Amino acid sequence: MQVTVETTEGLERHLTITVPAANIENAVTAELKKIAKNRRFDGFRPGKAPMKMVARMFGGSVRQDILGEVMQRHFIEAIVKEKINPAGAPTFTPVDIAEGKDLVFKASFEVFPEIVLAGLDQIAVEKPAVEVKDEDVTNMLDTLRKQQATWSDVDAAAEADSRVTIDFIGSIDGEEFEGGKAEGFALAMGQNRMIPGFEDSIVGKKAGEEFTLEVTFPEEYHAENLKGKAASFAITLHKVEAQELPELTEEFIAKFGVLDGSIEGLKTEVRKNMERELKQAVKGRIKEQVLDGLVEQNDINVPAALIDQEINVLRQQAAQRFGGDAKNTPELPRELFEEQAKRRVVVGLLIGEVIKTEELKADEDRVKAIITEMASAYEDPTEVVSYYEQNEKMMSNMRNVALEEQAIDALLAKAQVTEKEVGFNDLMNQPAA
């Protein structure tokens, strides 16, 4: 076997591989003999059919199969010999496949980029300094009560936290516009669902009133035809409701799994959950900044084959989220996933290089800690831990999670880290970058 390596611009590689004709012909002959021995032919006893007849009937298809197998096998031998690491499946192009002549074919593929990590000491990380305070727990209790709240009609003017039922018709320059009309619309005030000024104009009005309000759509409004436009809304207020929050009774508290029914018990459980969520949020915020810095400091070429693979994964996940079957769901445009897919591939390659450079191995104690922490959110943590420990595939996934955490820790040790005090709600409500 002869191999010629052609290095093109970027990550593309071409191998021209030559396989002696004798290798092909011997393999074809051996396969035809198997067919002659094992297949029944009319007019001939088993194994007695003439080879010429067998070759005439099956020679073409057998040769095609053999060529495919030979190209695949010799490609693998070639990349091992040349110490090449392909990033995806090759494309084979026959150059000379004439019978009786040496097989010559070209294999085209991409390789993984050679990565030399740089700028790790330039990664800037702002570590949130935050804790769950008593007032945060109190606010969370109020949130839980609001989730269980009821509404009742009141004969009073609407307030900033009322729920109102309205009809409205919107118009611009006297003309109604699409999406600007509704009947029996229930609006919980104070949640910023409407454009600025809309809810303010309802405050102080009572059921049965009809009025007109003047507002201006924000410049950043999602509908292009409404951005920055002045509009009028004719409103009929049908109903005003006030929110009634449940008391912190034993019955209410029991809904959250606090068996002793005490307020202190509920506070303890709520604080525990908040601290668990906070820990994950802090970890996630730090990880996000570390990865952003790593990508910013290391501009690498990315194999298109890996991006294509990741796009397919994201497509399947999207189909599942929408409750569909990937096979029966129309293929979503690759443009929807391309940027995210490339980011994932870049991060994966760079983290892989960190693991290699730092010679990291999954810390089994960390693996156990990750599983234990995750299991603590379930009713029976011991059962969850046992389930993971008995499933090798899931344990392998957890080892990968631990390994990634160790890589983040290694990068964090080299990064420029500062601390910034932040409130619980500010951190938890901070949008992802």
Curated annotation (Swiss-Prot):
Location(s) in or outside the cell: Cytoplasm
- Similarity comment: family membership: Belongs to the FKBP-type PPIase family. Tig subfamily.
Q: Which NCBIfam families match?
A: tig (TIGR00115)
Keyword Membrane found = no
What's the chief localization of this chain? cytoplasm
Name by which UniProt lists this protein: Trigger factor
Please report the organism this UniProt entry assigns to the protein: Photobacterium profundum (strain SS9)
Lineage, uppermost ranks: Bacteria, Pseudomonadati, Pseudomonadota, Gammaproteobacteria, Vibrionales
* An example molecular function term from Gene Ontology annotations: peptidyl-prolyl cis-trans isomerase activity
